[in-house]
Regions:
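Residue-level signal for inorganic ion chemistry
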Residues: 9, 27-29, 49, 64, ...
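ALDH superfamily catalytic-core signature
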Residues: 228-370, 433, 477
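Short, well-ordered beta-strand elements within core beta-sheets of diverse protein domains
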Residues: 31-37, 52-58, 144, 254-257, ...
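Conserved C-terminal structural/oligomerization subdomain of aldehyde/semialdehyde dehydrogenase
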Residues: 29-32, 218, 255, 309, ...
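Proline-centered turn/helix-capping motifs that create local helix->coil transitions or kinks
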Residues: 12, 109-124, 306-310, 344-347, ...
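Glycine-rich loop-to-alpha-helix module at the N-terminal edge of alpha/beta enzyme cores
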Residues: 27-118
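Rossmann-like NAD(P) dinucleotide-binding subdomain of oxidoreductase/dehydrogenase enzymes
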Residues: 120-264, 390
Length: 478
C-alpha cells in the first residue's frame, strides 16, 4: 500500500521524501510506503477547504449528519481489514485495535445524531416585542493534527464534530499512522463527501507544520501530541487570536488505599499501564500505595506483571504488543536503563517466542524512588510504571498532585467519604474511582488540567462547543 493525499476530492501523490513502513511486530515485513508532502500541498489543501466551507456550512446540521451516519456504516463493514492494517502499521494488538475501530463507529453515529439536537437558547429581552436568542455557527477551516497511538478513534473524535458543526478540515496525521489515515479518508470519499470538506495531507510535522499553522485561511486547530509541540501550537495560535485545542501529556496516578479490593486494583492498574504498550496519554504510569497495604499489593502486582503475554500484534492472545517505532523503542529503553541503574525492579515481564524481530519492550515496574525522580515525573509513553508509598490518604493526594500534568487519576477504595474527597481534591481533568485511568467514554468530555490540555474539552457535547462559535441574535417584531 502507498499513501496519497486527498485534497479537493482528488487523490494526489505528494512529491516529497518517502518512508518505507515496516511492521513493528516483525521488521522483516514491509507494510507499505508513505509519500511525504511539501508546503505546496498544504497551500492546495487550504485553498480547497476554504472553497468548500460556505457550501458545507449552508447545509443543515441534519444533512451534514447523514454523511457521518453513512461513514459509520462503511467503517463498521471495513472493521476487520482496517484494524489489521493499523495493527501492522503501528503495532497495537488486534483485539484492542478492533475495539478502537468500533469506537470510531460509535463516535460517527453519536455526532450524526447530534445533527437533529436542539441547540441554542432563547434569552428574555428587556424590551417589548424583541426576540433574542443564540445559535451556533461554524468556525471555518479547521486543522486537525492527530497522533499515531489511536490512529482511528482520535481522528474521528475530532473530524466528526468539526464536520457536523459546518467546518471544513485539513487533516495531518502522524507519520506512523499515515496508511491507516488514507483508508479512513477513503471511507469519506465513498459516502460522497463534497470535495474539499475533508482534506488529508500526509507529511512530517517539521516539514509542513509551519505552513499548516501559518496558512491564512485557518480558523482553528485541534492537536493531540507531545506537550512541547502543543505549547508551541498554542503560542502561535494565540498570536493570531485563533481558537485552538491541545491535548498533550500525562503522568497519571492510581492510588491504592488500605481498604481497596486488591485483586480489582491490580487488574485495573495492569490494564491501564500496559495495554497499548503504555502508549496512551491516559496510561497509568504512577501507582501510589498506602503503606499498610503496600506489601500485599506489590506482591499481587508482581505476579500479574510476570504473567503478561507479549506477542505480535496480530496474535489474538496478545496482551502487550510492540511499541510503534524505532524512536519509541529507543526512548522507552533509555528509561528502562535508568530504572536498572537507579531503582529497584519490582517486576518485569518475560520475553516471548516470535518477538525477536520487532520493537518489543518487556513491561517493567520500578520501586525505591522518591517523588521527584524522572521515572515518577517524566512521561515515558511505554510499558514502564513506578510505585511509591504513601503514609495515608492525605499524603497520597499530595503525591498524586505533585506533577506538571493533570490528565487522569484514579483511586481504589471502599470508603465513600474518601472517594468523594478524591474526586474533589485530585488535580486532574478526569478522576475515576475503582476504575483504571484510561477508558473514558466517548459521550463524556475528555481533557486535563495543567500542562496536559488547553482549556477546552474533546468528545461529548464539549466537542461541539469547541468547533463552533456563539452568535447572539435579536429581532424587533413590533
Amino acid at each position: 500500500m502507498e499513501s496519497r493525499n486527498w485534497i479537493g476530492g482528488e487523490w494526489l501523490s505528494p512529491s516529497g521524501e518517502e518512508m518505507v513502513v515496516h511492521n513493528p511486530s516483525d521488521l522483516k515485513e514491509e507494510v507499505g510506503v508513505v509519500h511525504f508532502s511539501e508546503t505546496s500541498d498544504i497551500t492546495q489543501a487550504g485553498d480547497a477547504a476554504q472553497l468548500a466551507q460556505a457550501g458545507w456550512a449552508a447545509l443543515s446540521p441534519a444533512a451534514r449528519g447523514v454523511y457521518l451516519f453513512k461513514a459509520a456504516g462503511l467503517l463498521e463493514a471495513a472493521l476487520p481489514e482496517l484494524a489489521e492494517l493499523a495493527s501492522r502499521e503501528m503495532g497495537k494488538p488486534i483485539t484492542e485495535m478492533r475495539g478502537e475501530v468500533m469506537r470510531g463507529v460509535h463516535l460517527l453515529r453519536y455526532y450524526a445524531a447530534e445533527g437533529v439536537r436542539s441547540i441554542g437558547t432563547v434569552i428574555p429581552s428587556n424590551e417589548p416585542g424583541v426576540l433574542q436568542y443564540t445559535k451556533r455557527i461554524p468556525l471555518g477551516v479547521t486543522a486537525v493534527i492527530t497522533p499515531w497511538n489511536f490512529p482511528v478513534a482520535i481522528p474521528l473524535w475530532k473530524i466528526a464534530p468539526a464536520l457536523l458543526c459546518g467546518n471544513t478540515v485539513i487533516w495531518k496525521p502522524a507519520e506512523h499512522a499515515s496508511l491507516t489515515a488514507v483508508r479512513v479518508a477513503e471511507l469519506f470519499e465513498a459516502v460522497q463527501l463534497p470535495p474539499g470538506v475533508l482534506n488529508l495531507v500526509i507529511g512530517q510535522g517539521n516539514r509542513i507544520g509551519d505552513a499548516l499553522l501559518e496558512h491564512p485561511v485557518l480558523d482553528a486547530v485541534s492537536f493531540t501530541g507531545s506537550t512541547a509541540t502543543g505549547l508551541g501550537i498554542a503560542e502561535r495560535c494565540a498570536r493570531r487570536n485563533m481558537k485552538y485545542q491541545t491535548e498533550m501529556g500525562g503522568k497519571n496516578a492510581a492510588i491504592v488505599l488500605k481498604d481497596a479490593d486488591v485483586a480489582q486494583a491490580v487488574a485495573m492498574i495492569v490494564s491501564g499501564a500496559f495495554r497499548s504498550a503504555g502508549q496512551k496519554c491516559t496510561a497509568t504510569s504512577r501507582v501510589i500505595v498506602e503503606q499498610s497495604v503496600y506489601d500485599t499489593f506489590t506482591e499481587a502486582l508482581r505476579q500479574a506483571v510476570e504473567q503478561i503475554q507479549i506477542a505480535p500484534a496480530l496474535d489474538p492472545g496478545a496482551y502487550l504488543g510492540p511499541v510503534a517505532s524505532a524512536g519509541q523503542y529507543e526512548k522507552v529503553m533509555s528509561y528502562i536503563s535508568l530504572a536498572r541503574r537507579e531503582a529497584e525492579i519490582l517486576a518485569e515481564g518475560g520475553a516471548a517466542a516470535g518477538t525477536e524481530n520487532g520493537y518489543y519492550v518487556r513491561p517493567l515496574v520500578a520501586t525505591g524512588l522518591n517523588s521527584s525522580h524522572p521515572l515518577i515525573q517524566k512521561e515515558i509513553f511505554g510499558p514502564v510504571m513506578g510505585v511509591v508509598q504513601a503514609d495515608d490518604f492525605e499524603d497520597a493526594i499530595r503525591l498524586c498532585n505533585d506533577s506538571i500534568y493533570g490528565l487522569s487519576a484514579s483511586l481504589f477504595t471502599r470508603d465513600l467519604r474518601l472517594a468523594h474527597r478524591f474526586l474533589d481534591e485530585a488535580n486532574a481533568g478526569m478522576v475515576r474511582v475503582n476504575q483504571e485511568t484510561a477508558g473514558v467514554e466517548y459521550q463524556a468530555p475528555f481533557g486535563g488540567l495543567k500542562q496536559s490540555s488547553s482549556h477546552t474539552r474533546e468528545q461529548g457535547q464539549a466537542a461541539l462547543d469547541f468547533y463552533s462559535a456563539i452568535k447572539t441574535c435579536a429581532i424587533s417584531y413590533e
